């Protein structure tokens, strides 16, 4: 919905060529191996994202490096990751809702619960705390329909102050991507 509203392309952060291996990696219990797999998928998706951006085509993704790092740290991965310069820098929205609403939405999902989903539930507070260190626009979605959530996201000023974000200058932290693209023409190549 967001991609259509922005005239953007929705890019999967786990590319189709990764899907079969994704199932195998997800079956394993190794958080570090899983984190490395998802980082590889993200770097591969980033190549495609950059091609679109270089052509002037906006891009939407459902998750990016912040999710990978926050979740896997909460899952127990103990890898130190420094993201390279030059990655596309997203405007990130953190969709939040009341716990009762979150539980209701989880119960209505039509997919089996994986061990990683269960681990995410056990570590939900750790994941939320980890997200707080990333620059994001918090959008409260409690009681909203998908169309209303879309309107709430679209009405958020992407360059405004972010109440839930750490205000430390993003360049000072090696794991964070700034929320506002800072790209000069040709800075990332063609």
Q: Can you describe what each PLM-predicted range is?
A:
Residues 5, 55-56, 134:
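Structured helix-beta-strand junction loops
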Residues 84-98, 104-152, 173-178:
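Small-molecule kinase domains that catalyze NTP-dependent phosphoryl transfer to phosphate-bearing small molecules
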